[in-house]
């Protein structure tokens, strides 16, 4: 194996960590879209940026990027971001309910028993 091949193989083994590292250092949702070369409508991102990134994280949790070449790891991350973005193009953050506060807003509330204090307890 030549030094170039060894260097390339070593770079590929670090590739998933590299793209993930770049995404972790991104300072805005727009940077995610730019890093992964995903086209987006600024109006959608302005309304749902945190929701899109949270959903992307949920989708990425199901992906195994370990050991993938850089190009494939980047392509998978791109596909995941496109999928998360598409969720919010087709519907609203309220419809998707990514965050707990939105899930709890529509969760059925358990009926509470009426408060009862016996007269004996008042003595």
From Swiss-Prot:
A single BP term in Gene Ontology: nitrogen fixation
Keyword terms of this UniProt record: Nitrogen fixation
Record-linked InterPro entries: NifW
Protein family: Belongs to the NifW family.
Subunit structure: Homotrimer; associates with NifD.
Protein role: May protect the nitrogenase Fe-Mo protein from oxidative damage.
Name this protein carries in UniProt: Nitrogenase-stabilizing/protective protein NifW
Organism for this UniProt entry: Rhodopseudomonas palustris (strain HaA2)
């Amino acid at each position: 194996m030549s030094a170039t091949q060894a260097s390339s193989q070593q770079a590929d083994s670090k590739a998933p960590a590299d793209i993930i590292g770049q995404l972790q250092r991104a300072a805005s949702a727009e940077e995610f879209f730019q890093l992964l070369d995903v086209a987006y409508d600024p109006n959608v991102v302005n309304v749902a940026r945190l929701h899109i990134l949270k959903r992307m994280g949920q989708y990425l949790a199901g992906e195994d990027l370990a050991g993938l070449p850089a190009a494939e790891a980047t392509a998978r991350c791109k596909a995941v971001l496109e999928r998360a973005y598409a969720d919010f193009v087709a519907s609203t953050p309220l419809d998707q309910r990514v965050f707990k506060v939105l899930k709890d807003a529509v969760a059925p509330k358990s009926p509470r028993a009426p408060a009862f204090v016996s007269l004996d307890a008042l003595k």
